[in-house]
């Protein structure tokens, strides 16, 4: 198995923090690099080390295989980012290794690029207009000013409907997991559903926030909205338990 270092900056065990498998033990593989530059109402991207300032890779295919071997009691894997579908050949190979180790595979993606894989669940998190970066503000992780180029790049890729449709059609299961900042975001969610043909029971609305206080502010009205409109609600378990920490 190759010893080439891959654009993977984290591998660890955790409970899935979001979506239909929330609370299920997973092996998380985080891929570095993303086309988007998310900035929400109260927060930036929660993994800026994979997007705004992507770290270099640290792991090989051999490392990934050995991690599976060391954790045989965990049967679910999520491959996330960053944007894992940007690294097509690597993603296909990671899925092959995971399947050889009897894993259920979730691929978490913003949906900007299509790739057909052995993944079991596509966790599709298309970014609404509430994620568009604001030129002139400071990105805390990098200390740099957000530019018009950041905004232009983000807007170019945040809603690739063709790629999202192909991801849905070419995998056994999927969920749509948009980040919600305010009630007005619901109109964009409904438009996404209309374009992609997604029923309500496949949608998990998730409150924006990197701090417990931010989640608390949105949780009540969002759960009420989900009940009223017939959507699933998903919390952010890792933030509730650990706050904005890495490796959890």
What do the predicted segments below correspond to?
Residues 2-4:
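Short coil-to-beta-strand transition motifs
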Residues 33, 49, 209:
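Short, histidine-centered active-site or binding-site loop motifs used for metal coordination
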Residues 21, 55-57, 216:
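Short, solvent-exposed loop/turn segments at secondary-structure boundaries
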Residues 6-13, 25, 36, 40-122:
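Conserved Radical SAM active-site core
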Residues 17-21, 33:
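Short secondary-structure boundary/capping segments within folded domains
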Residues 65, 85-248:
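Conserved AdoMet/S-adenosylmethionine-binding subsite of the radical SAM
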């Amino acid at each position: 198995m190759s010893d080439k270092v891959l654009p993977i900056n984290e591998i660890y065990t955790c409970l899935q923090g979001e979506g239909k498998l929330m609370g299920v033990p997973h092996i998380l593989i985080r891929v570095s690099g993303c086309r988007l530059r998310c900035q929400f109402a109260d927060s930036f991207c929660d993994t800026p080390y994979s997007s705004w300032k992507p770290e270099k890779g640290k792991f090989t295919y051999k490392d990934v295989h050995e991690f599976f071997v060391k954790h045989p009691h965990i049967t679910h894997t999520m491959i996330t980012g960053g944007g894992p579908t940007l690294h097509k050949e690597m993603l296909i190979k990671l899925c092959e290794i995971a399947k050889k180790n009897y894993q259920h595979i979730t691929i978490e993606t913003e949906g900007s690029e299509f790739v057909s894989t052995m993944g079991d669940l596509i966790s599709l998190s298309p970014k609404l207009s509430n994620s568009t970066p604001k030129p002139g503000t400071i990105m805390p992780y990098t200390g740099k000013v957000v530019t018009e180029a950041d905004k232009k790049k983000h807007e170019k890729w945040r809603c690739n409907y063709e790629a999202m449709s192909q991801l849905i059609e070419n995998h056994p299961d999927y969920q749509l997991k948009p980040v919600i900042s305010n009630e007005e975001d619901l109109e964009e969610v409904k438009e996404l559903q209309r374009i992609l043909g997604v029923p309500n029971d496949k949608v998990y609305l998730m409150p924006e926030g990197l701090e417990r206080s931010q989640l608390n502010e949105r949780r009540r009205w969002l759960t009420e909205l989900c009940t009223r409109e017939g959507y699933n609600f998903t919390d952010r378990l890792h933030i509730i338990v650990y706050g904005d920490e890495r490796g959890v």
